[in-house]
Design a protein with these regions (language model features):
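Conserved Nudix-box catalytic region and its N-terminal flanking loop in Nudix hydrolases
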Residues: 21-57, 61
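Conserved N-terminal beta-strand and adjoining loop/helix that marks the start
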Residues: 1-23, 44
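Charged phosphate-binding loop/patch that engages nucleotide di/tri-phosphates or the phosphate backbone
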Residues: 133-147
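Unchanged
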Residues: 45-68, 79-133
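Short, charged/polar surface micro-motifs in flexible loops or helix N-caps
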Residues: 16-20, 29-30, 46, 92-98, ...
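Short, solvent-exposed loop/turn elements at beta->coil junctions and helix N-caps
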Residues: 1, 73-79
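Short connector loops at helix/strand junctions that flank enzyme active sites
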Residues: 8, 35, 40, 67, ...
């Protein structure tokens, strides 16, 4: 990898239940680029992980839940200065276990948010594009967003 052009692989998942998405309000870390934003759960790949491995680990770490039914919905390429991030975007509607609301306490606060209210929250502008695609139930999509 060219050190002048670093790449990052991440996952993000929106758990769905009763017309709501499980959202993480990122309020804990002060120097967090997502500070005060509402996002799904997920994170960075660890060494040797596949997108699915990362998804399952991150959801379990941040929620206490083990996913049983999930779907890769798209790949979002973020251009952030010299960094390129490839985010594998998932939704899930099946899991086992009980939600541990403070599992993500190092990241923020977990809340179930009605899908109709998500775009009124402080979210990234680009996220509004993929929220629309998720609501339209597009089978798969790819986006490129520059910040």
């Amino acid at each position: 990898m060219d050190p002048k052009f670093p790449m990052l692989n991440t996952t993000l998942c929106y758990l769905e239940q009763d017309g709501k998405w499980l959202m993480l309000h990122r309020v804990t870390k002060k120097n967090d680029m997502n500070h005060d934003k509402w996002i799904g759960v997920g994170g960075k790949f660890e060494r040797f992980e596949s997108p699915e491995d990362c998804l399952l680990r991150e959801v379990r770490e941040e929620t206490g839940l083990t996913l049983t039914n999930y779907r890769l919905r798209g790949i979002v390429t973020f251009l952030l200065g010299s960094l390129t991030e490839y985010m594998f975007l998932y939704t899930a509607d099946g899991w086992t276990g009980e939600l541990v609301k403070d599992a993500a306490r190092n990241e923020g606060v977990l809340e179930w948010v009605p899908k109709s209210e998500v775009e009124a929250l402080p979210v990234w502008e680009g996220d509004k594009i993929f929220f629309r695609l998720l609501k339209e139930d597009r089978p798969f999509f790819s986006l490129k967003l520059k910040y």
